[in-house]
UniProtKB/Swiss-Prot annotation:
This is Hydrogenase-1 small chain. Its main location: membrane. It is an enzyme of class 1 (oxidoreductase). It comes from Escherichia coli (strain K12). The keyword Cell inner membrane applies. The gene is hyaA. Keywords: 3Fe-4S, 4Fe-4S, Cell inner membrane, Cell membrane, Iron, Iron-sulfur, Membrane, Metal-binding, Oxidoreductase, Signal, Transmembrane, Transmembrane helix. Residues 1-45 form the signal peptide. Residues 349-372 are cytoplasmic.
Length: 372
């Protein structure tokens, strides 16, 4: 692959200047949370490494992951597709169709055996021998296994591929199955969400291209750089949660004031994703900022956890399990206790200082002799 076109060469061929290329590397480093100091390393990698071939296949899904990906802003999806990677097969985005598209698929997995990244959107249904999802005239499960056999790594796009999503909701008549339950001998990184945040998708690809490895993941296989914290942890309404200020109905005064949406069913306290920090639509907003609670779409089994508008009963708060009704009072109690302790300590310190202070008589000249 040494004679193949690199990312930098592809960008220069498209008329991108050196200055713009370095700016791109700086933005990529920032979006990955690596800091500006990593920009030179990203630049070196993209100047010297050939573009990675990517095969993107679709199982049971609604194509929302693709729709999200093409709206990426940092980096732009067009830069990822046309320059950063070599997206050789994606039956949604490619011009070829039918037999011609399948010939491309076979050529890529044969020519780049062991070198390409497999991106999977959707999941395989195992019921009725896989006949609930047909691709190229045969069950999708067969295509998935064939593509996975020669892949260097696999990306599970979205909640469908990661957990099963709505297709796997009870009673799961098609036996829709997450891909890690079917492919067990390959490294798989899960990027859940319905859909995932577009900038998260493109940033993960940038990381893999730059460092030739998967990003660090949690015990469930999600990249820590984007799924290491709950939406609740960085939510701008968090202060209202801690103060016990909650919206009680969609049209009340608390809703107009932007109070916490936890009582309206917001799943932010139990959902790990980057919505509250990265946001959507080029960082413009996210559901909670738009006035609607988080649905928890990045979590496993979110379709089977009751109504989207029923709140979580208990969540950890300040070392105890407090409900939304009591957490505000608890916070106020802690503050009141702290104020009380401070007041008592101040009074004791003041009395101690008063007892140690010499009297006015003791400081008068000659008093030492009189006392003697």
């Amino acid at each position: 692959m040494n004679n193949e076109e690199t990312f930098y060469q592809a960008m220069r061929r498209q008329g991108v200047t050196r200055r713009s290329f370095l700016k791109y590397c700086s933005l990529a480093a920032t979006s990955l949370g690596l800091g500006a100091g990593m920009a030179p390393k990203i630049a070196w990698a993209l100047e010297n490494k050939p573009r990675i071939p990517v095969v993107w296949i679709h199982g049971l899904e609604c194509t929302c992951c693709t729709e999200s990906f093409i709206r990426s802003a940092h980096p732009l999806a067009k830069d990822v597709i046309l320059s950063l990677i070599s997206l050789d097969y994606d039956d949604t985005l490619m011009a070829a169709a039918g037999t011609q598209a399948e010939e491309v698929f076979e050529d890529i997995i044969t020519q780049y055996n062991g070198k390409y990244i497999l991106a999977v959107e959707g999941n395989p249904p195992l019921g009725e021998q896989g006949m609930f999802c047909i691709s190229s005239g045969r069950p999708f499960i067969e295509k998935l296994k064939r593509a996975a056999a020669g892949a260097s790594a696999i990306i599970a796009w979205g909640t469908c591929a990661s957990w099963g999503c709505v297709q796997a909701a009870r009673p799961n008549p098609t036996q829709a199955t997450p891909i890690d339950k079917v492919i067990t001998d390959k490294p798989i990184i899960k990027v859940p969400g319905c859909p995932p945040i577009p900038d998260v998708m493109s940033a993960i690809i940038t990381y893999m291209v730059t460092f030739d490895r998967l990003p660090d993941v949690d015990r469930m296989g999600r990249p820590l750089m984007f799924y290491g914290q709950r939406i609740h942890d960085k939510c701008y309404r968090r202060a209202h949660f801690d103060a016990g200020e909650f919206v009680q109905s969609w049209d009340d005064d608390a809703a107009r004031k932007g109070y916490c949406l936890y009582k309206m069913g917001c799943k932010g306290p139990t959902t790990y994703n980057a919505c509250s920090s990265t946001r959507w639509n080029d960082g413009v907003s996210f559901p909670i900022q738009s006035g609607h609670g988080c649905l928890g779409c990045a979590e496993n089994g979110f379709w089977d956890r009751g109504s989207f508008y029923s709140r979580v009963v208990d969540i950890p708060q300040m070392g105890t399990h407090s409900t939304a009704d009591t957490v505000g009072l608890t916070a106020l109690g802690v503050v009141a206790a702290a104020v009380g302790v401070h007041a008592v300590a101040s009074a004791v310190d003041q009395r101690r200082r008063h007892n140690q202070q010499p009297t006015e008589t003791e400081h008068q000249p000659g008093n030492e002799d009189k006392q003697a």
